[in-house]
């Protein structure tokens, strides 16, 4: 099995995990704000990382040599994640994910500058096809642009920065190290932002299972994403995430009765085709 195919399989795990996190995040959004959700999610994440690190003997892999890169990576991710959690509470899930999926396009544009990865015709074509698919799904108009849509679009830039610096970290750091600093720094950011008004809400018994799900799903998503980025270039890995759009569109329809039409599937078909062509091209090179 080629490294590219392995990376795609791990990205599939990330897609399922991110979708589960969206459902759980919406379920508790009426009780906790986005900063509080991020804070409690990070507490769960730290516990999981420390327990698994102790079990597998990988805690010794946590180093301080790239703290600056970890900080930039997690600031970028924290901003993107909070904007994303806000957007899923006010905008249909399919539209949030569609706008978020401009993230691979930012990765495509920035990777040659920050990671020294090169553009290829197929990678650019996959990115363009993904963007065209997103426009078909969302069909943005002047009336459709609101604060939730803007938040979803801005979250994509944050996630792109996170992906790029994650890729840089995978060159020298282990997954345990990356996930440890992810959870610790996100917790620190969450406490500061959630407590700025002196009032941090405690979760109820009803929301605890959802918070645990968010914590586990978020950590699993980042494990899969980090592993995928260690196996293949960011310009190959990130466009695979486009497949999450039709998945979450179906979730929105089945769970929240959100309207879905043929344009979602037409756009998704274009997105999938672009991804398939890119993966096929990279697999032939391997």
Residue ranges and their predicted role:
Residues 1-16, 46-72, 121, 173, ...:
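Membrane-interface interhelical linkers
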Residues 3-7, 34, 39, 62-66, ...:
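Juxtamembrane helix-entry segments on the extracytoplasmic side of multipass membrane proteins
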Residues 15-23, 50, 74-82, 104-109, ...:
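Hydrophobic/small/kink-forming positions within alpha-helical transmembrane segments
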Residues 23-26, 49, 143-203:
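Transmembrane alpha-helical segments that form core, pore/gating elements
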Residues 31, 87-90, 116-118, 172, ...:
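Helix-loop interface residues and adjacent transmembrane-helix termini in multi-pass membrane transporters
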Residues 86, 103-125, 246-265:
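C-terminal transmembrane-helix exit sites in multi-pass transporters
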Residues 96-102, 169-185, 222-253:
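Helix-helix packing/entry segments at the starts of transmembrane helices
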Residues 122-138, 263-282:
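Hydrophobic transmembrane alpha-helices of multi-pass small-molecule transport proteins
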């Amino acid at each position: 099995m080629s490294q590219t195919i392995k990376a795609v399989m791990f990205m599939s795990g990330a897609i399922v995990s991110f979708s589960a996190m969206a459902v759980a995040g919406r379920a508790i959004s009426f009780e906790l704000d986005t900063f509080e959700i991020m804070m409690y999610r990070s507490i769960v994440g730290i516990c999981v990382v420390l327990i698994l690190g102790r079990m597998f003997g990988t805690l010794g892999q946590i180093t301080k040599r790239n703290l600056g890169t970890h900080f930039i990576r997690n600031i970028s991710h924290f901003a993107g994640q909070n904007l994303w959690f806000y957007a899923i509470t006010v905008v249909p899930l399919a539209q949030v994910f569609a706008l978020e999926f401009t993230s691979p396009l930012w990765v495509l544009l920035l990777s040659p500058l920050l990671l020294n990865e090169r553009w290829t015709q197929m990678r650019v074509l996959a990115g363009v096809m993904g963007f065209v698919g997103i426009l078909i799904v969302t069909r943005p108009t002047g009336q459709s642009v609101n604060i939730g849509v803007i938040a979803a679009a801005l979250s994509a830039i944050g996630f792109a920065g996170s992906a790029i610096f994650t890729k840089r970290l995978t060159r020298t750091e282990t997954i345990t190290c990356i996930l440890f600093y992810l959870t610790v720094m996100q917790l620190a950011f969450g406490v500061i932002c959630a407590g700025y008004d002196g009032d941090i809400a405690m979760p109820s018994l009803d929301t605890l299972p959802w918070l645990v799900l968010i914590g586990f799903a978020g950590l699993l998503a980042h494990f899969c994403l980090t592993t995928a980025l260690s196996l293949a270039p960011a310009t190959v890995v990130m466009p695979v995430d486009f497949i999450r759009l039709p998945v979450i569109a179906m979730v929105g329809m089945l769970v929240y009765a959100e309207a879905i039409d043929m344009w979602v599937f037409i756009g998704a078909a274009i997105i999938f085709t672009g991804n398939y062509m890119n993966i096929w091209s990279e697999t032939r090179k391997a």
